[in-house]
Amino acid sequence: MASTMIPYTVNIKLAARTLTGTLNLQNKTAVDWGWQGLIAQGCHSSILIIDPNTAQTIQVLERHKANVVKVKWSRENYHHSLSSPYSLRLASADAAGKIIVWDVVSGMAHCEIQEHSKPIQDMDWLWAQDASRDLLLAVHPPNYIVLWNGDTGTKLWKKSYAENILSFSFDPFEPSNLALLTSEGIVFITDFSHSKPPGSGGKKVYIASPHSSPAHSKPAAAQPTGAKKALNKVKVLITNEKPTAEAVTLNDCLQLSYLPSKRNHMLLLYPREILILDLELSQTVGVVAIERSGVPFIQVIPCAQRDALYCLHENGCITLRVCRSTTPSPNETVTDPEQNSQELVYDLRSQCDAIRVTKTVRPYRVVICPVNENKAVLVVSDGRVMLWELKAHASKSSSNLSSGLPPLYSAVNFCGTPLRQNQKCIPDLSLNSMIGHSLIPGVDSPRPLADQKEVHLKFLLTGLLSGLPLPPFSLRMCPPLTTKNINHYQPLLAVGTSNGSVLVYNLTSGLLHKELSVHSCEVRGIEWISLTSFLSFATSVPNNLGLVRNELQHVDLRTGRCFAFRGERGNDEPAIEMIKVSHLKQYLVVVFRDKPLELWDVRTGTLLREMAKNFPTVTALEWSPSHNLKSLKKKQLAAREAMARQTTLADAEQSSVESSVISLLQDAESKSESSQGISAREHFVFTDTDGQVYHITVEGNTVKDGARIPPDGSMGSIACIAWKGDTLVLGDVDGNLNFWDLKARLSRGVPTHRGWVKKIRFAPGKGNQKLLVMYTDGAEVWDTKEVQMVSSIRVGRNVNYRILDIDWCTSDKVVLASDDGCVRVLEMAMKSASYRMDEQDLTDPVWCPYLLLPRAALTLKAFLLLQPWMDTFTMDITQVDYKEKDEIKGLIQEQLNSLSNDIKSVLQDPNLSLLQRCLLVSRLFGDESDLQFWTVASHYIQAFAQSAQSNESVPEGQAAASHLDICHDILCESSFFQGFQLERVRLQEVKRSSYEHTKKCADQLLLLGQTDRAVQLLLETSADNSSYYCDSLKACLVTTITSSGPSQSTIKLVATNMIANGKLAEGVQLLCLIDKAADACRYLQTYGEWTRAAWLAKVRLNAAEGSDVLKRWAEHLCSPQVNQKSKAMLVLLSLGCFQKVGEMLHSMRYFDRAALFIEACLKYGVMETNDDINKLVGAAFVDYAKLLRSIGLKQGAVHWASRAGEAGKQLLEDLSQTEGTGTESSPADDTDNSLVNIE
């Protein structure tokens, strides 16, 4: 590199990187969007890590040998601290059955797992949080599920099933439930645990394909709404018997997923419909169908925050469908009363533009942002990644009566709290802040609240990443960096493609600089003639005479102008074999297949010489690096100085000007050299078919023939030549390299035994004698001084792609084009490299705290959460007393700067409450466990604070505006939960289609206390049914139950006997009939039916009794064998046991969360003060202060220590002492201190 000659060095460090292109069909399902905010995507055997906000590829992971078929980010549902930091962990699986768990920032494989050698069908990390975070479940074909420890790579257990497993889905509400989609149906597993494999073979159900049911065979044209009516008749889709052969030929179910928005619901996707099942009845309760002319589905993603579905269609269109609220709005007349209660209806609320689908271009997958659920990314087979963002805009009203859909209303809350006056907010922060929750009859007022606006949703394309087109490619790097061009140098790589366009990439950023459509056929070669212009040539397919159309274009990058360099020539002539530009970029040689070569002047674009017919056929050609430009310049300079002397005035002060005038003249001269008369002498050598070497000299427009060197007997037909300094290298078709030392007049042959030498190129940089050699099966780097090989890469041995073209991009990095459609920039050792992300030189800064060091990430979080020591909130870390290396400070500041202006202004808004801030920061960090905790905490802290103000004992009679979304299930308010369950039974009742279903509905109604409806259902039993008598008696019993003592005690006795003899459900029913639901819950808990008991408590018991049941459940969740403390905390939050939650947080060492939670409780006045609580407050605040001290935020530590009262005195003294002496205790000591619990 020339930079060694100058005192300062220029930073042109090119990172090793991979430019990727089209995807392989096996990469179709390999894409995932993690809570960390990044997208991982498989491309052949590499994995791209993409930042969706700036649409940049920030890492490429290379280690797989086969195509990547699945990628999965690990979940972030645990409390983050120094010992369990924010980290980017990704699992990827390939077509050869290998799973790799990556540390994405460093690009290193954390562990590798291999069981069989077939493609992994599906895999996912376990979500049950307090268990191990490292567990990974994978489907190894054909029929095994294996649980792995993703940290160590050890196998925990393995289980086989009778059918081939296609995919699986975890129940998001119950970690022990898992559903497998198999080739014949669905297998439900209810005893999934990480400690041992499932015991049974699971419950198998078969899917009768909806199209084979008789309802569909009716001609649809008979009635106008044929499709709808037919779909309503598809009642049963799930049978326990295996369907007959003609009924189901093939399970064409594309996908199965549990709905994360409500418990016990699942969706099945078929090409033309989505079925929503209620698993308690295993019964369809909703169908989303595509009309005849519509475009079939490929994939659907259910949302958690709202009952909504993102669907991907075969034309690449993404649609959003939102479940319609069942309450009719007041101004809406119910036209079809039956339809209203018939089923769940998902209305199409928004759709994005389709893409142009061709044979090679089709949509593969869509992923949505798991944190906010308002962005979707579409991956297309040609390597494009399209980022669609959902935007909500409010409209006045009633504008969508035309569409016939009930309106959608905006959400009331921002970050869990109703907005205050002039508070800044981000309406499009997440799906649940864009649209309000679905209403439930009997609980919600059907009219929108005062501040709810009607909203419309729109998709906007906010980012696009495109890949390279299909190979083959030809590569050429622009001229190397020198001392002269150092100020304006850009490392540009030109890539010629098969469709005739030339892509120019800037290799510092890896981004496409220009895409130029230059030719009409495949580009065969490119030669740069300056830093901003190049010549490229392309040849068409030969006709029957073997003649082609040659295109040789001159392209100027700055303007994009291209013109045909050879003018009118080029039609019907032999194909151009190669073009070679001389070192001074003065002359160009064009070599043809069966026609003598042409010599052109590059600067004027004129033909200097077309060689005679008897000119030898050229097999290889290279320009010599020697020329006489320097001696010419010296002569010119002498003449110039003589001129200057004659014209100089005799004044003394004039002489000081003289030298500068001359230097100006020289500058002008050197600039105009290329365009003006001066023509230096240059030479080139070439070989003919016999291996004879010719030497030709060109000066101006004279061409002289020089000496000839007879062929070397040991070489075959020469294929290529390279020349640098005093070394000339020849390569032949048999794999021999011949090194000539021109100074010492020595030659040395080396057989490489690798077959045809396709290309050889010397590395740039003065005195750099490395040589890059390309063969049909790979490439090698040679050191020509020592005449020995430095590194080698070979197809099948260390890589699985073929190399199509090579070049040097700097003095120590090479660039390879390969047939998997990628262009790789590699170190000279040619090991395929993932790079460290933190060494990347990105064009746009990326917000991703996970890229920081663990301590720095926690500092950033603490900095954003609370700055109570400042009057105003700042986004500048330098304004805070933060003792840390400047480099780390700089990285934190970069993260802060990369936040969007909206978010910055909201964070700096003094109106943002502590609870909103905690929620917003957990969203920014993609911290699942924080987000869940603060959502529930902020809701119930505010609810209990409100009810305390209005002197109500329980927060039941509240404005329904603010109940928790149903996706929180048992954590919701009882009234809301009850309403939801009643609505659900009503739907099940409408949909029931067999005696089994009717019986289940009657049972549910009895538990919910809806006795009249239950009696009606019981009396429906037909006389020929075996349980006719039993049901009739039950109906009589239900209607005659009065609260007289004797009958109650009898029933209670019968119920307890039933339970003791194993009829738990029946006994519980009887207890519910006589209003002894609390006893029923106790029995359920004794027999381990904890969730069922919690459900019953929510729907039947008053607040005090219900909270007893739920507290017992929380205790059970905390027990070591269950170990779901975080879930127990959420249950306690919903009961308002804030002190207990504070103590639990502190004892689990969640110091930051504990301190902020207690602070919020004190602020809202939901913790009364007594000695116990003061003690807790002191301990929590001191520990948080120590944590802040250990991560370097001293002011924060002082603030919290001073708030801790007595407990904080000692720490305050320590802090002020270190201040006084100016010594900062080392973080290692701090962490030891903070491990001691202060009581």
UniProtKB/Swiss-Prot annotation:
Protein name stated in the entry: WD repeat-containing protein 11
Annotated compartments: Cytoplasm, Cytoskeleton, Cilium basal body; Cytoplasm; Nucleus; Cytoplasm, Cytoskeleton, Cilium axoneme
Entry keyword Phosphoprotein: yes
Gene: wdr11
Record key words, sorted: Cell projection, Cytoplasm, Cytoplasmic vesicle, Cytoskeleton, Golgi apparatus, Nucleus, Phosphoprotein, Repeat, WD repeat
SUPFAM superfamilies assigned to the protein according to its UniProt record, in alphabetical order: WD40 repeat-like
Keyword Phosphoprotein (UniProt): yes
Pfam families: Beta-prop_WDR11_1st (PF23751), Beta-prop_WDR11_2nd (PF23752), TPR_WDR11 (PF23753)
Gene disruption: observed consequences: Morpholino knockdown causes microphtalmia, microcephaly, melanocyte disorganization, curved body axis, motility defects and narrow trunk. Morphants also exhibit aberrant head cartilage formation and cranial-facial dysmorphology.
Cellular component terms (Gene Ontology): axoneme; ciliary basal body; cytoplasm; cytoplasmic vesicle; nucleus; trans-Golgi network
WD repeat boundaries on the chain: 63-112, 115-158, 358-398, 476-515, 571-610, 713-750, 752-792, 798-836, 898-944
GO biological process assignments: cilium assembly; head development; heart development; intracellular protein transport; multicellular organism growth; neural crest cell migration; regulation of smoothened signaling pathway; vesicle tethering to Golgi
Quaternary structure and partners: Component of the complex WDR11.
Family annotation (SMART domains): WD40 (SM00320)
Task of the protein: Involved in the Hedgehog (Hh) signaling pathway, is essential for normal ciliogenesis. Regulates the proteolytic processing of gli3 and cooperates with the transcription factor emx1 in the induction of downstream Hh pathway gene expression and gonadotropin-releasing hormone production. WDR11 complex facilitates the tethering of Adaptor protein-1 complex (AP-1)-derived vesicles.
